[in-house]
Amino acid sequence: MSRWLRWLLSFLPRTAPPGPRLAIVRHHRVYAEGQQPLYRLGVGVATLERQLDLLGALGFTPVTVAEGLAWLRGARDGMRVAFSFDDGYRDNVALAGPALERRGARATF
């Protein structure tokens, strides 16, 4: 990820309204590196890994959507990010699954 984009995203926690935050990141497809995307609603594995790493470095804890909604109704400490992979494509689990697992992150499929 470019230094400029990392710098820009570093303002996210500071510019959001005070209080707990639940960010939701949604992807339709996950592409292997070098694979030509069929449409722009997908993400490459390396990009997904950078998203996970950057949001983790910014202090977001990865949760499922259900966990994030329960957290909003409960204690609400810190910041949470819910990754959602919709449409049930095999690449969601086959490619995103290992990237999430390596980081101990959870997501909604």
Task: Cite the ranges covered by each PLM segment.
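Catalytic alpha-helical scaffold of carbohydrate-active enzymes acting on polysaccharides/glycoconjugates
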Residues: 1-109
